[in-house]
A protein has these predicted regions:
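Formylglycine-dependent sulfatase
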Residues: 2-10, 26-411, 417-471
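Bacterial N-terminal signal peptides
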Residues: 13-23
């Protein structure tokens, strides 16, 4: 039996209106949905450690794909060339001197009583005002007491370790062997265990990150994935050992690359890649004194802890299909800029108070330069300033080596011509030296210096700390 369908113009009209409304609603929902943000922060990865940055033997196909499909920065900088202050700068958009995240010990240790002030506004705490789900996975290192931990800085969840993976009794430092507790692994404020096998950390962090993305695929989210690698001691899973020509260091970097690949694949499967801004970078330059276990600064001078380019300039790739152009960008940008740039995507009228970062939206989406200056600090002291192509040292770059001393200052380099900082041009360019000197003094005079949060030692460690420092 055949069923005859009659065409009723009125019915067709209502069907047309119904589907039009659904289509409009879906398009409107996609248009208005806030973007997701993922920051993947490697630990001690050097400027020259990725295939897309010229490494001859370390294979990083997923990060290279990110670079090919997005924006590869050649002049991207951190807020400090060492761990704790660099992480504070990324999350707050402020130079560490403004938040007190500096000190003679360079970073926070398990015996420290201080940390990042909970009153500081972070990317996570700001995004919570716009109904974002937020997660910190991996390494924190901004204070291990409860009031300084991620849950008090805008993160809904934390899964990882409170400080560096080498701050444990098993290390080579005699003070740590005698005094530091076993390295704790936390889920929120709960300790899952101590002295866990670090060879599984990259896999654990990746799995947890993917779970977070899956759980929040239908709402805006911010994921801060801060790997503990390739910081020493180098640890990686059994199935990834012995795969890289570069040896163990190469194995670790390649496992991080595969982790990035899994996250990108997850975004694609969920059909949210086009609405997710992913940025991969490093907290500072490579650990130069780790020898074969450390990374490469490429053609740049200096390493982690240095005010030379190799300490401050890091690999960085931004990826957001159909939004971020496929280009190698020579524009200046820094981790300080991530806070204002991310918040401007959510609220164009967001008020940024007392921050040092710039909104580099035009750089990210149009490859238009915005930033002109980079400040290089050692603890709370400005050592050098980059202004456009010129970099001026006003203080001794490294008082512990046989290089230039304070009496040799100032030093002037054309960074675009001489990224290795070999040729001092100060005597040939007195007007440029004078101009940059004025910029340095203006910056020093206008920058608030907060008291250091590093100095206080927990009472349980004070006597051992004092005894050790008598030696």
């Amino acid at each position: 039996m055949q069923i005859k369908l009659e065409r009723n113009p009125k019915h067709l009209a209502w069907v047309f209106i119904f589907f039009t409304l659904i289509t409009f609603s879906c398009n409107n929902d996609n248009h208005e949905r806030k973007p997701n943000f993922i920051i993947i922060f490697a630990d001690d990865l050097g400027y020259g450690d990725l295939g897309s940055y010229g490494h001859p033997t370390i294979k990083t196909p997923y990060l290279d794909q990110m670079a090919n499909e997005g924006m590869r920065f050649t002049q991207f900088y951190v807020g400090s060339s060492i761990c704790t202050p660099s992480r504070a700068a990324l999350l707050t958009g402020k130079l560490p001197v403004q938040t007190g995240m500096y000190g003679k010990r360079s970073v926070l240790f398990p015996d420290n009583a201080g940390g990042l002030d909970p009153k500081e506004v972070t990317i996570a705490s700001a995004l919570k005002n716009y109904d974002y789900s937020t997660a910190c996975i991996g390494k924190w290192h901004l204070g291990h007491l409860e009031q300084y931990m991620p849950l008090n800085h805008g993160f809904d969840s934390f899964f990882g370790i409170p400080y560096s993976n080498d701050m444990r009794p098993e290390g080579k430092w005699d003070y740590a062997r005698e005094n530091f507790p076993p390295l704790p692994f936390l889920d929120g404020s709960d300790t899952l265990g101590v002295s866990l096998d670090q060879s599984n950390f990259i896999k654990m962090f990746t799995k947890k990150s993917i779970e977070f993305i899956l759980e929040n695929r239908n709402q805006p989210f911010f994921l801060y994935l801060a790997h503990t690698a390739p910081h020493t001691p180098l640890m990686l899973s059994k199935e990834n050992k012995g795969l890289s020509i570069r040896g163990t260091y190469g194995d670790v970097v390649e496992e991080i690359d595969r982790s990035v690949g899994e996250i990108l694949k997850t975004l694609a499967k969920l059909n949210i890649a086009k609405n997710t801004l992913v940025l991969f970078t490093s907290d500072n330059g490579p650990w130069g004194w780790a020898n074969i276990d450390g990374g490469s600064s490429g053609l740049l001078k200096g390493n982690k802890g240095s005010v030379y380019e190799g300490g401050y300039r890091v690999p960085a790739v931004a990826w957001m299909p159909k939004s971020i152009p496929r280009v190698t960008s020579t524009a200046l940008a820094t981790t300080l800029d991530l806070f204002p740039t991310i918040l401007s995507q959510v609220d164009k009228d967001f008020e940024f108070k007392s921050i040092d970062g710039f909104d580099i939206t035009k750089t990210l989406f149009e490859n238009t330069p915005v930033r002109t200056d980079v400040h290089y600090y050692r603890q709370d002291t400005l050592i050098a300033l980059r202004h456009k192509e010129w970099k001026l040292f006003i203080k001794d770059p490294n008082p512990w080596d046989d290089g230039p001393k304070q009496e040799d200052m100032p030093l002037l380099y054309n960074i675009e011509h001489d990224p290795s900082e070999k040729y001092d041009l100060a005597k040939d360019n007195p007007e440029i030296v004078q101009k940059l000197n004025i910029l340095c003094q203006d910056h020093i005079n206008s920058t608030y210096k907060a008291p250091s949060k590093y100095e206080a030692i927990l009472p349980a460690y004070q006597s051992a700390y004092d005894e050790y420092n008598k030696k």
